[in-house]
């Protein structure tokens, strides 16, 4: 009887898998959330997860920070917000440098102190500016400088960007809600 039940269950799931249309490339988040890797605000076990692929030099990403703050205020502990890098170097020549700087700050627990500074002053992302923001964010500058040039930091930014490319993303900001790509406006009303 248990063998028959197993066989029927297996057949049912195989048939429904074949009847279900596959999720198109770019509509599903390919890398699961990794608390030890990702930049996260909110409880790890929150029922809602909002992942943003963004670029510190992108004016739309800068404007979206206000929307994200409103969404976080609306959902409170029900929401986990995750930032991932997608520097669009073709149009934002300082974006990768800014992403690397945020990763160097993150190694000191200062990602969410550094990111708002770079968004606020995104027209000023030359190295002397970035070091000033790191200082304002409370980073140890000698360690920041060392980490900034480390392979670990560069690989972290490249990993996010490669994930974005595999998902066929082409613009920032791009949001995923509970693992599925958000289509539509990225203002707070559209995300709520």
Predicted regions: what they are:
Residues 58-61, 101, 144, 175:
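Hydrophobic packing within well-folded, soluble alpha/beta domains
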Residues 5, 50, 114, 144:
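Divalent metal-coordination and catalytic microenvironments
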Residues 2-14:
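Transmembrane alpha-helical segments of multi-pass membrane transport proteins and ion-pumping complexes
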Residues 57-61, 91-98, 107-111, 123, ...:
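Solvent-exposed, acidic/flexible segments
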Residues 74-134:
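Structural microenvironment flanking redox-active thiols in thiol-disulfide oxidoreductases
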Residues 1-3, 22-23:
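C-terminal structured "cap/appendage" subdomains that terminate the fold
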Residues 53, 69-70, 131-192:
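C-terminal cap of thioredoxin/glutaredoxin-like
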Residues 11-90, 94, 149, 153-171:
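Extracytoplasmic thiol/disulfide redox context detector
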């Amino acid at each position: 009887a248990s063998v028959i039940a197993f066989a029927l269950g297996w057949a049912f799931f195989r048939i429904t898998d074949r009847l279900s249309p596959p999720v198109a490339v770019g509509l599903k988040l390919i890398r699961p959330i990794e608390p030890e890797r990702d930049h996260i605000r909110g409880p790890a076990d929150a029922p809602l997860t909002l992942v943003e692929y963004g670029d510190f030099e992108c004016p739309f990403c800068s404007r979206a920070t206000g929307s994200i703050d409103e969404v976080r205020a609306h959902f409170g502990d029900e929401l986990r917000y995750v930032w991932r890098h997608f520097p669009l170097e073709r149009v934002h020549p300082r974006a990768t440098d800014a992403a690397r700087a945020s990763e160097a700050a993150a190694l000191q627990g200062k990602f969410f102190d550094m990111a708002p500074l770079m968004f606020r002053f995104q027209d000023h992302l030359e190295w002397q500016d970035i070091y000033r923001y790191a200082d304002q964010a409370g980073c140890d500058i000698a360690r920041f400088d060392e980490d900034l040039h480390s392979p670990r930091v560069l690989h972290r930014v490249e990993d996010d960007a490669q994930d974005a490319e595999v998902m066929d993303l082409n613009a920032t900001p791009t949001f995923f809600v509970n693992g599925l790509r958000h289509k539509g406006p990225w203002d707070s009303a559209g995300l709520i």
